[in-house]
Amino acid sequence: MHIQPKNSPDKLRRNAAAFLEDDEHVQALTYATNSLVAGRGANFAIVATERNIYVIVAHMVGLGTRLHKVNNKFPLSGATAKRSDGGIWINDFCLKELPRWREETAAFVDYVVGAAQKASSRREVTGVA
C-alpha cells in the first residue's frame, strides 16, 4: 500500500482544483514561501492553468497543508517565471523555493515559459496583441 504524505503534489493538485474557475484544470503547480526563516511568513500554492496563474494562501496544519483563499490571480498569457538563487520569480514578485518542491518548481517555470512563448508566437503569426 502506498501512503502519500499529507502535503504531496497530488493532494495539493486535488485541493487546488476547488479554487479554479469551472472550466480550468491544473497544468502545473508548486509550493513556496515568502519567509527566509522556517515557520514565519506565509506559504503559497502557486497553480498554473490553461489561462491563469493562481497564488493561493496555504496554512500548515499538522503534517499537511490547508488551502485558504486566492491571494492573487493573473493571466498566464502575459506572465513571466524564472528560478534564481533559491527563489522563484513570478512576474515581479519572488517567493522562496522549498527544497522538497524543486522538481515541481522547475516544471511550473517550464510550463509558464512555454505558455508565454506559444502566446508570443500566436501574436506574431496573427498580428494580434
Language-model features and meaning:
Residues M1-A45:
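Anionic N-terminal interaction surfaces
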Residues A16, A28, R51, T105-F108:
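Generic intrinsically disordered, low-complexity segments enriched for polar/acidic and small residues
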Residues D22, Y31-G87, D92-W101:
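Phosphoinositide-binding peripheral membrane targeting modules
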Residues E104-A129:
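Terminal and domain-flanking low-complexity segments
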